[in-house]
Amino acid sequence: MELKISIVTCSDTHDLAQDEAGAALEELIEAQGWTVASHVVVRDDVSEIGDAIVEAADECHANVVLTCGGTGLSMRDVTPEATRAVCEREVPGIAEAIRAYSMTKTRRAMLSRAICMQRGHTLVVNFPGSTKAARESWEAIADQLEHAAQMTAGGGHTN
């Protein structure tokens, strides 16, 4: 299955040209032979993040939306809240897997509030905003994204 993956970077301080974590994710997606359906940078704002997720899922028809940034403890970090506002179902195992893998790299991973949810047939996964942490999050789940996308599209389990 060829995946279409959208990237939504959440940052008050970066634009698309400065988005190193998003650019790294683009490279990783393309290295898998998958398509980057869209890549936008939005402010750390619940409405803007939610709108970008909806557009990626509903207009770009992404199988997966990766948000990047806004998952920490700062009051401006609102990506999990924005994700919950526009999605229907939690997929806790993916966020748990990212945290477990990241904890082998840094104990600070326990401070992440990142979540994973499903919006219709689209999986929405929150990644941290640093390039290193975004790469590690990708490493933690990339091998399961195709199966997850098949499942959210209504497919059955494969062995």
What do the predicted segments below correspond to?
Residues 1-159:
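Non-catalytic beta/alpha edge segments that cap or flank active sites
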